[in-house]
């Protein structure tokens, strides 16, 4: 078919060179370097050397920077991420630090609560030397005021992500960031103490590109109402912020909102606020966690109008204001639902049967802390949820019969987590191995025995995310260093305690499931 006659392949020049220079043939004396001190990296381009550095850990990169002046220069010019222990004593060293690291685009400044942080003057120097910053984190920088934030914003106009925690500046500093950083996309504020009662409202310019807002443990956080109501915003997450938030969500407009994700946790919001959220016709993800004033009526108003809802998390906090009535509305209107988490919600056979029958795209389901869910309800799910892939059940009145029903039904089920269900015995594990060899199962004794998941499952499903991070030290692309062994031990303790917390376990499980699916789809 027109092919040339076969002939012996010519040796590859690259393979030949590698063979000639391999360690077993290399002899420094034969090539004229009797002392053996020849630098074989001298002929490597700087870009190639920098690429090699990217595969090293933070500690190895620091040690490599001491090898030669060239390595020091290459390492400094190619570190784009830097984390500093932002104590006040760092001020005289800032010029030297940024002379070496002159290409930083992601900067973290962290100070522990027992020390004085860097001041407005130091932050101004940082903004002058790192004008190309796109991501900044401020943690515990209590000496920075509104004036410091304003000067920083004027010099760092390319900033895209800003995260501040345990700082004392107020609304003026935040407004300055929003005014000068026109391309800011993500704003995260935690424990900002400068938002007093007379604080000026947060203003967003018409040309702003803000896409995500995260507010946590704020006093008078309602001053951010204009941000929540802006039409460009995609994601809102509000956790443990004081005051009533109904008015904020009422400002969402008449269906012109672009919000696709809303997460509310331990917040004073009622059905009035949910009525406002229902105006977000593009909403795809809704988390209602420990909001005791929300009822079936508010939930029904959201699901009736938000036809694109794909992920729904409800933590009823055992106040029993959300039950079958609200879940029946979910079954009727949320036909695109893919992920459902019910914690402390007394769902019955009627509502679960309706959800299993109508929500044909449901892939991830978690039922926790309910006294009304037994073998009959699980059997109904097993029979009707033909697309279910991952299922987590915790603290419910099911037995081996319900677990066996899941194995016999749900043909696409790949992961099953059963926790704190006292009527489920270990014998069902062996039964599952025989019937569903590919099914990944996690049960109570997996943690006590130190075993991850049955049949070689993914250990990441059992991991718990620790919110509080230990303060890091100077670091590079290899990751953020950690300073202070005491806080590291506290983080480990929180991780262990997190494995015993049902709600955190379920939230982590669903988060890992979603991430693994996103990775596999790519």
Swiss-Prot record:
LRR repeats lie at residues 115-140, 141-166, 169-191, 266-290, 291-316, 319-344, 348-369, 370-393, 395-420, 421-447. The keyword Repeat applies. Residues 38-84 form the F-box domain. One of its GO terms (molecular function) is ubiquitin-protein transferase activity. It comes from the Eukaryota. PANTHER family: F-BOX_LRR-REPEAT PROTEIN 16, PARTNER OF PAIRED, ISOFORM B-RELATED. Gene3D superfamilies: 1.20.1280.50, Ribonuclease Inhibitor (3.80.10.10). One of its GO terms (cellular component) is cytoplasm. Disulfide bonds: none annotated. This is F-box/LRR-repeat protein 16. The gene is FBL16. Keywords: Leucine-rich repeat, Repeat. It comes from Arabidopsis thaliana.
């Amino acid at each position: 078919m027109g092919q040339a006659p076969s002939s012996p392949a010519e040796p590859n020049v690259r393979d030949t060179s590698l063979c000639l220079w391999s360690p077993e043939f290399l002899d420094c004396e034969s090539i004229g370097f009797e002392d053996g001190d020849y630098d074989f990296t001298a002929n490597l381009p700087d870009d190639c050397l920098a690429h090699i550095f990217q595969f090293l850990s933070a500690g190895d990169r620091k040690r490599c920077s001491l090898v030669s002046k060239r390595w020091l220069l290459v390492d400094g010019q190619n570190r784009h991420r830097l984390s500093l222990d932002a104590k006040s004593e760092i001020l005289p060293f800032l010029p030297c630090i940024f002379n070496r690291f002159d290409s930083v685009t992601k900067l973290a400044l962290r100070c522990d609560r027992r020390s004085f942080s860097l001041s407005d003057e130091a932050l101004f120097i940082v903004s002058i030397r790192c004008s190309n910053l796109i991501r900044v984190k401020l943690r515990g920088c209590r000496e920075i005021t509104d004036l410091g934030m304003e000067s920083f914003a004027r010099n760092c106009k390319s900033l895209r992500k800003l995260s501040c925690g345990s700082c004392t500046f107020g609304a003026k500093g935040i407004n300055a960031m929003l005014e000068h950083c026109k391309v800011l996309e993500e704003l995260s504020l935690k424990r900002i103490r400068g938002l007093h009662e007379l604080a000026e409202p947060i203003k967003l310019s018409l040309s702003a590109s803000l896409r995500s807002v995260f507010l946590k443990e704020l006093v008078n956080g309602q001053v951010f109402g204009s941000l929540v109501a802006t039409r460009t915003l995609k994601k809102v997450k509000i956790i443990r912020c004081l005051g009533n938030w109904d008015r904020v969500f009422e400002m969402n407009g008449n269906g012109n909102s672009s919000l696709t994700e809303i997460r509310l946790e331990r917040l004073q919001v009622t059905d009035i606020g949910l009525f406002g959220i229902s105006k977000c016709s593009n909403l795809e993800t809704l988390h209602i966690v420990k909001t005791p004033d929300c009822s079936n009526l508010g939930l029904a108003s959201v699901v009736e109008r938000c036809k694109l809802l794909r992920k729904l998390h409800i933590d009823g906090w055992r106040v029993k204001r959300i039950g079958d009535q609200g879940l029946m509305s979910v079954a009727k209107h949320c036909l695109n639902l893919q992920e459902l988490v019910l914690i402390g919600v007394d769902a019955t056979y009627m509502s679960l049967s309706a959800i299993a029958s109508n929500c044909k795209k449901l892939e991830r389901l978690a039922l926790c802390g309910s006294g009304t869910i037994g073998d009959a309800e699980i059997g109904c799910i097993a029979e009707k949820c033909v697309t279910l892939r991952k299922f987590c059940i915790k603290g419910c009145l099911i037995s081996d019969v319900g677990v066996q029903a899941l194995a016999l039904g749900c043909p696409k089920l790949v992961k099953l987590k059963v926790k704190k269900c006292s009527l489920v015995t270990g014998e069902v594990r062996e039964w599952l191995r025989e019937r569903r060899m590919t099914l990944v199962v996690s049960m109570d004794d997996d943690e006590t025995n130190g075993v991850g998941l049955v049949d070689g499952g993914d250990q990441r499903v059992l991991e718990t995310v620790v919110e509080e991070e230990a303060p890091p030290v100077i670091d590079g692309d290899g990751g953020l260093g950690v300073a202070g062994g005491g806080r590291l031990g506290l983080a480990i303790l929180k991780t262990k305690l997190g494995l015993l917390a049902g709600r955190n376990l379920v939230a982590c499980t669903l988060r890992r499931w979603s991430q693994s699916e996103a990775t596999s789809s790519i």
